[in-house]
Amino acid sequence: MAIDENKQKALAAALGQIEKQFGKGSIMRLGEDRSMDVETISTGSLSLDIALGAGGLPMGRIVEIYGPESSGKTTLTLQVIAAAQREGKTCAFIDAEHALDPVYARKLGVDIDNLLCSQPDTGEQALEICDALARSGAVDVIVVDSVAALTPKAEIEGEIGDSHMGLAARMMSQAMRKLAGNLKQSNTLLIFINQIRMKIGVMFGNPETTTGGNALKFYASVRLDIRRIGAVKEGDNVVGSETRVKVVKNKIAAPFKQAEFQILYGEGINFFGELVDLGVKEKLIEKAGAWYSYNGDKIGQGKANAITWLKENPAAAKEIEKKVRELLLNNQDSTPDFAVDGNDAEETEQDF
């Protein structure tokens, strides 16, 4: 619809005044020629990258990863850091739980010599450090482990047993308002690890909830629910965990998809195992009996030998990965893989 000429002039004058006062790019038309695609970082799991719909976690956004104890939350974030560092990005780890193991991080491929690490005394200090790193524009990925360990200063200075109702929720709510804009401007990915608590007296629906109030649920562009669903065994020895991740919230693609992969102890996500499975599923790798073949050449008898061949031939592995991403990310179906409980999707509780 054509706009009246006088209105057009008035709009142009208003836009000019806004850009003069607040800087170029402070207001623009949504369809203007600028990058509409969200830049992403791989999670280290091919199936999870595909479930997210954009090929990874989005830059400039807030992401929440939550789940029970020993479900793989920290491992997943360390894999994200390793993937980001391989792309030459700068990463920071805010270790509020004081439990980061540098030896394990190195095994997962993290360059610990170039990883910024902070062990803050209070929750306010941790969030101020996050904000300062985001405003610097020099840090690409920040991980906070975990929201439950972000203890307000008043609680630390008080005595055990004192009531501090809603302090952590208010602190998080204030921090989210401040952080969201700074993260977008600096294109920094901020990942919060969170723990699960049980709501008392819930008769119907999901009794589980996450700590730190409701603000994080609203501000997060992606929320991932990670669970251990089984054990990976070699003979009688348990060598890893079968893991399922549900995309509970997704603002960059269709939500409610899920991914399943293995986390091997001391190694991290079994990426090459996923590559073999997805390659066979998409008919990029041929499977006849126990033999696996690629481009007509046999690459191994049994999955373990096929994985070994891919590790020894990184160029072929990269080629298969690229083809899988092109096939599955370009043909994303907007229909959810599954439905979540109403409590997972609902975010209408009172914000502190």
UniProtKB/Swiss-Prot annotation:
> Which InterPro entries does the record match to this protein?
AAA+_ATPase, DNA_recomb/repair_RecA, DNA_recomb/repair_RecA_CS, P-loop_NTPase, RecA-like_C, RecA-like_N, RecA_ATP-bd, RecA_C_sf
Task: Extract one GO molecular function annotation from the record.
Answer: damaged DNA binding
> Can you quote a single GO CC term?
cytosol
SUPFAM superfamilies named in the record: P-loop containing nucleoside triphosphate hydrolases (SSF52540), RecA protein, C-terminal domain (SSF54752)
Indicate the principal place this protein occupies in or around the cell. Answer: cytoplasm
Q: Which domain of life is it from?
A: Bacteria
The segments labelled Disordered in the record are 333-352
- UniProt GO BP: DNA recombination; DNA repair; SOS response
Q: Which residues bind ATP?
A: G67, P68, E69, S70, S71, G72, K73, T74
Q: DNA repair: is it a keyword of this entry? A: yes
Where does this protein have compositionally biased stretches of type Acidic residues? 343-352
Q: Which UniProt keywords apply?
A: ATP-binding, Cytoplasm, DNA damage, DNA recombination, DNA repair, DNA-binding, Nucleotide-binding, SOS response
Q: Where are the transmembrane segments?
A: none
Where does this one sit in the cell?
Answer: Cytoplasm
Family matches, as NCBIfam families: tigrfam_recA (TIGR02012)
What PANTHER family does this protein map onto?
MITOCHONDRIAL DNA REPAIR PROTEIN RECA HOMOLOG-RELATED (PTHR45900:SF1), RECA (PTHR45900)
Q: Give the family per the record.
A: Belongs to the RecA family.
Stated role: Can catalyze the hydrolysis of ATP in the presence of single-stranded DNA, the ATP-dependent uptake of single-stranded DNA by duplex DNA, and the ATP-dependent hybridization of homologous single-stranded DNAs. It interacts with LexA causing its activation and leading to its autocatalytic cleavage.
What is this protein called in UniProt?
Answer: Protein RecA
Its gene name is: recA
